[in-house]
From Swiss-Prot:
Non-classical progesterone receptors involved in extranuclear signaling are classified in 2 groups: the class II progestin and adipoQ receptor (PAQR) family (also called mPRs) (PAQR5, PAQR6, PAQR7, PAQR8 and PAQR9) and the b5-like heme/steroid-binding protein family (also called MAPRs) (PGRMC1, PGRMC2, NENF and CYB5D2). Residues 94-103, 159-169, 259-276, 338-346 are extracellular. Its main location: membrane. It comes from the Eukaryota. This is Membrane progestin receptor alpha. It is found in: Cell membrane. Pfam families: HlyIII. Expressed in a wide range of tissues including ovary, testis, placenta, uterus and bladder. GO terms for biological process: oogenesis; response to steroid hormone. It is a multi-pass membrane protein. Belongs to the ADIPOR family. Residues 1-72, 125-137, 191-237, 298-316 are cytoplasmic.
Length: 346
């Protein structure tokens, strides 16, 4: 009888032990919400669902890497491309003497710059939903990556792809102007994000410096395409250069027009957004560009070695200056954002 009483007291306590962990478990967080449940800062044109809730843990946002939401494709397009670039760099290391060949440094810089913009972009699209401050800050970081890539592209084109005639015209100003325009592009993009004005002023701040930077950066390639119009010329890199131009123009078109989601409002929450197509064509542009630059590095040494015997400017210093000034710009704008948000909460 005493044993039965002890067991009757023990069984409820065992049931409590089993049930308590179940009661203590928090409900699984909701991974996506409608547009009305997030601030207007996070809204995308014509996208009404698939947003991630704010103010979750960092672990939550990293877990969304494997969930469906309206930024998932943007994350994976650039994340996978960054991994492909690491594999491409491993192949370069087997065939290119980066330490012993001084002419290989621009090739390394363009690979590094490409990996930087792709990884920064993937990080921004993955984590920007944490809060308003982090939304601004991560996209400022994204614009730093774009500026770094702009200068890396300019350097690679100027070093390997340029024809002697165009080199003679622009050698004194090309790289300093490329560094300045890359930084100006970073400033314009960050400022446009900061002021949050979708009209003419915002687009001018972001797009005009970027257009000027691209026009300068791609000029050695365009000049070479026009002067190498002979179809019998054995220049396999030229096809890749043409492809990178076409892919970039397609990317720019989708970036600027919000197509096709403007044709199907409310139907492109996960797939089919213009920004996703912008990412895809930009990745194709970068991969074609790297193949062209690699071919030029191997085949055009008799052309570019004499051109770069004496440097009017230190391109490594200009690269570091572009990186440093862009990071400083993003940091200062993030501080302004913090002040603006603090004033809003008072």
């Amino acid at each position: 009888m005493a044993m039965a009483q002890k067991l009757s007291h023990l069984l409820p306590s065992l049931r409590q032990v089993i049930q308590e962990p179940q009661l203590s478990l928090q409900p699984e967080p909701v991974f996506t919400v409608d547009r009305a449940e997030v601030p207007p800062l996070f809204w995308k044109p014509y996208i009404y669902a698939g947003y991630r809730p704010l103010h979750q843990t960092w672990r939550f946002y990293f877990r969304t890497l494997f969930q469906q939401h309206n930024e998932a494709v943007n994350v994976w397009t650039h994340l996978l491309a960054a991994l492909v670039l690491l594999l491409r760099l491993a192949l370069f290391v087997e065939t290119v003497d980066f330490w012993g060949d001084p002419h290989a440094l621009p090739l390394f810089i363009i690979v590094l710059a490409s990996f930087t913009y792709l990884s920064f972009s993937a990080l921004a699209h993955l984590l920007q939903a944490k809060s308003e401050f982090w939304h601004y800050s991560f996209f400022f970081l994204d614009y730093v990556g774009v500026a770094v890539y702009q200068f890396g592209s300019a350097l690679a084109h100027f070093y390997y792809a340029i024809e002697p005639a165009w080199h003679a015209q622009v050698q004194a100003v090309f790289l300093p102007m490329a560094a300045f325009l890359a930084w100006l592009s970073c400033i314009g993009s960050c400022y446009n994000k900061y002021i949050q004005k979708p009209g003419l002023l915002g687009r001018t701040c972001q797009e005009v410096p970027s257009v000027l930077a691209y026009a300068l950066d791609i000029s050695p390639v365009v000049h070479r395409i026009f002067v190498s119009s002979d179809p019998t010329t054995d220049d396999p890199a030229l096809l890749y250069h043409k492809c990178q131009v076409v892919f970039f123009l397609l990317a720019a078109a989708f970036f600027s027009t919000f197509m096709p989601e403007r044709w199907f409002p409310g139907s492109c929450h996960v797939f089919g957004q213009g920004h996703q197509l912008f990412h895809i064509f930009l990745v194709l542009c970068t991969l074609a560009q790297l193949e062209a630059v690699a071919l030029d590095y191997e085949a055009r040494r008799p052309i570019y070695e004499p051109l770069h015997t004496h440097w009017p400017h230190n391109f490594s210093g200009l690269f570091l200056l572009t990186v440093g000034s862009s990071i400083l710009t993003a940091f200062l704008l993030s501080q302004l954002v913090q002040r603006k948000l603090d004033q809003k909460t008072k």
